[in-house]
A protein has these predicted regions:
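Patatin-like phospholipase
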Residues: 1-28, 33-277
Length: 277
């Protein structure tokens, strides 16, 4: 998420795009969060300070009691965590915590599509102001970010909805099939360059996350995706409790992720034959 925002910021700084002109966003999990953050229409300095300097370990605590409580909640975190994370941003824009997707669209004028997966029916869910107009924005965020163990799934209308990464990690084809001009699409695709081995020293969480990411990798749809000229491949690490904990606790780790995203944007501009500022 930090890398993606830094990429967009650097591209705008170099006049490659204008974020305020974005009309439609397709994203899953962290990509969906990036879309929401952009749609809130903060300036980059305010948004960067919020994301880098906020003590996120207080919002997403990882301790023994938290782990024990997860058994009944089906996850370490739930809607209360999402509310705590987004409340300062929504308050700053005089938006309610209960704002619906329809009302958020009226505010942002951006057509956001967030992708999740319904376990009960084994199908991908496209969450937008068109498909779920009365759904609360924060519930939609929980749905697309409900990675097993970390975030509790959302159970409504006979559906059990979790993170869409297992079926639609990079919704490029969904975006193209909607009829959007392919030359006007900017894609930011995450690629994991390292796949840590599960060993005798691995924890239960390492084992579960390792399995999830292997499953996502096996379901990779790169070969089925239409190539686009405006695509940035962002190098990311597989999520582990250690990586998550470090990013939540350490401001410098978050700064490094921003810097990594900035460098990826510059490399893209360089390869595109464009000078950067």
């Amino acid at each position: 998420m930090f890398q993606e925002l830094a990429i967009l910021q650097e591209l705008e700084r170099n006049n490659y795009l204008t974020v305020s002109n974005i009309e439609t966003i397709y994203g899953t999990s962290a990509g969906a969060i990036v879309g929401i953050l952009i749609s809130l229409k903060f300036d980059w300095t305010t948004l960067n300070d919020f994301l880098i300097k906020r003590p996120w370990n207080n919002v997403f605590p990882i301790h023994v009691q938290n782990i024990l409580d997860s058994y009944g909640k089906r996850g370490l975190f739930d809607i209360k965590t999402v509310e705590k994370a987004f409340k300062p941003l929504l308050d700053a824009k005089d938006l309610s915590l209960d704002i619906t997707l329809e009302d958020f669209f009226k505010y942002s004028k951006i057509d956001i599509h967030m992708f999740a997966f319904d376990i009960n029916q084994s199908k991908t869910i496209d969450i937008s102001h068109k498909t779920f107009p009365t759904l609360q924005l924060l519930t939609a965020i929980q749905m697309t970010c409900a990675l097993p163990i970390l975030m509790a799934p959302v159970c409504i209308d006979n559906m059990c909805i979790m993170d869409g990464g297992v079926s639609c990690n990079y919704p490029l084809n969904n975006c193209i099939s909607s009829g959007i001009n392919i030359d006007e699409i900017l894609g930011i695709k995450n690629k994991c360059s390292e796949h840590p081995l599960i060993t005798q020293d691995s924890t239960l969480f390492d084992y579960i996350f390792g399995f999830i990411y292997k499953a996502i990798f096996r379901l990779n749809t790169d070969d089925e995706q239409q190539p686009i000229k405006n695509e940035i491949v962002s190098d990311s690490n597989n999520l582990t409790i250690e990586i998550l904990s470090n990013a939540l606790k350490n401001m410098e780790v978050r700064r490094e992720l921003f810097e990594k995203g900035t460098n990826e944007a510059r490399l893209f501009l360089q390869n595109s034959g464009q000078e950067f500022l």
